[in-house]
């Protein structure tokens, strides 16, 4: 139980990783009136989950966990570099880097482990960029949480943060936000099964539409979010 409670802490949208500052391109769709209410946001976030989250952070999280199972810590830095290089939008790329660096610093204090200390040192030495998916996987492995639970929790944490940002950005009501989190759970369960079967070569295979929205975000006249 204590292990799960520790993992829940990382999934809390109040965990100060900086995720509250990022919409990952969804703000572009809000300003263009593609997203206007609960249903349009739910549709958009479902596309984001299926076409981007599964193939980037979700797959990286499970690959990082498997690398530690195989005692291949050097693979974590390789994954870190692939995640950074495959992120086309500058705002999203730098946002993920800042969030990863911040999360690594917090977790090395809260849940220290030799692997996390080494990864954090690599970030400090500029030999790694930092990414929350890798930090989350390291902490989950250290806590001896199962691989499937780890990736499911990581997907939920990402979606929960985006829903909270939608409450502010669209806006939608808090109750509608919680309804989305309930309604989206079958998709996240599907995601765990899907990601478990993806090869490493699929890492970064995302929808260009989402990437274009993330790049266009840089030129919006008014922005609530950093990406």
Curated annotation (Swiss-Prot):
NAD found in the keyword field: no
Keywords per UniProt: Chaperone, Cytoplasm, Nickel insertion
GO molecular function (one): nickel cation binding
GO cellular component terms, semicolon-separated: cytoplasm
HAMAP family given in the database record: UreF (MF_01385)
Role, per record: Required for maturation of urease via the functional incorporation of the urease nickel metallocenter.
Record note on quaternary structure: UreD, UreF and UreG form a complex that acts as a GTP-hydrolysis-dependent molecular chaperone, activating the urease apoprotein by helping to assemble the nickel containing metallocenter of UreC. The UreE protein probably delivers the nickel.
Protein name (Swiss-Prot/TrEMBL): Urease accessory protein UreF
Organism in which the protein naturally occurs: Bacillus sp. (strain TB-90)
Lineage: Bacteria, Bacillati, Bacillota, Bacilli, Bacillales
Protein's gene: ureF
């Amino acid at each position: 139980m204590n292990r799960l409670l520790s993992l829940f802490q990382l999934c809390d949208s109040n965990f100060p990783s900086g995720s509250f500052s990022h919409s990952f391109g969804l703000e572009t769709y809000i300003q263009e009136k593609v997203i206007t209410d609960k249903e349009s946001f739910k549709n958009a976030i479902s596309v984001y989950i299926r076409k981007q989250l599964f193939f980037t952070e979700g797959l990286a999280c499970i690959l990082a966990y498997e690398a530690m199972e195989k005692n291949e810590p050097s693979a974590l830095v390789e994954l870190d570099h692939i995640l950074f290089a495959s992120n086309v939008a500058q705002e999203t790329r730098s946002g993920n880097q800042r969030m990863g660096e911040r999360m690594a610093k917090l977790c090395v204090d809260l849940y220290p482990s030799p692997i996390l200390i080494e990864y954090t040192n690599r970030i400090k030495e500029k030999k790694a960029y930092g990414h929350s998916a890798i930090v989350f996987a390291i902490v989950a492995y250290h806590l001896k949480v199962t691989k499937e639970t780890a990736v499911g929790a990581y997907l939920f944490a990402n979606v929960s943060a985006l829903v909270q940002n939608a409450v502010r950005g669209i806006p939608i009501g808090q109750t509608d936000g919680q309804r989305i989190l309930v309604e989206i759970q079958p998709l996240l369960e599907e995601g765990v099964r899907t990601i478990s079967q993806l090869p490493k070569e699929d890492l970064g295979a995302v929808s260009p539409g989402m990437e274009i929205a993330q790049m266009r975000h840089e030129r919006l006249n008014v922005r609530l979010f950093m990406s």
